[in-house]
Amino acid sequence: MQFALRNLIFGHRGKPLLPPLTLTLESGQLVALIGRNGSGKSTLLQTLAGLLPSLAGQMMIKTSGRHCPESTLHADVHSIVGKVQQSGGQPLCEESSSGATTQEEWIIDFSSLSPAERARWVSIVLPTTPEVPPLTVLEVVQLGRWPHRHASLSQRDATVFVDSVLHRCGIAHLASRPMHALSDGQRQRVMLARAVAQDTPILLLDEPTNFLDFQATQEVFQLLHQLAHEEKKLVIVATHHLDWAKREADKTLEIRR
């Protein structure tokens, strides 16, 4: 899978933060996004996630059927292909006589997707906020499975998957605890676990190690390394840990303003 930005312009209230941005990122890459506070890292990540509209340009995904989120293939592949056609894209898809998509390669206009469709492609971890949902840790992490509710994964398998995510993120012992009873660092790890449970090809993280001690920070970075290099996700991390970025990231993007 490739995630391509073509002359992308992003910013606040119609005011661009940077000149047009053009680059291509790929599955299996761990990308560090660095820059001073206020440089636009968070704005860029939220634009990539579709939480903020871009001002101009395109965000395109080039992928094959085997790399598509399973729920996309089972639920609304035709709506995605149709939207690409309407937006002038070039979906390289064919249909069999039964109506199934048989050709492997697609080019998808990411910005044309609905929020539900985007949620199967990209998940994002934002900095913690004072607002705390009246839910337990387990319930919050289970929310990550909502975009895949039409997938073929059985309820039992989904439960096993969520349980494995809780263990991988080091919060299994907190599963029944209400969110309001957690520290800021624990809440941050819960939101990371929710994004991991969403199981998307693209994972965006905005300062995911805020409020974490040294040991917890190293564990999070190790998890991100595994997600990128072993599970072949595209992982983009906004961080101030410059030593880690230089040592571990496959690519470093610096925003200068």
What are these regions (language model features)?
Residues 49:
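Helix-to-loop junction immediately C-terminal to a conserved catalytic motif
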Residues 178-182:
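Conserved ABC ATPase signature
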Residues 203-206:
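Catalytic Walker B motif of ABC-type/P-loop ATPase nucleotide-binding domains
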Residues 251-257:
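H-loop (His-switch) and adjacent beta-strand-loop-beta switch element
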Residues 34-36:
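The feature captures the beta-strand-to-loop junction immediately N-terminal to the Walker
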Residues 142, 156-174:
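Conserved ABC ATPase "signature" region
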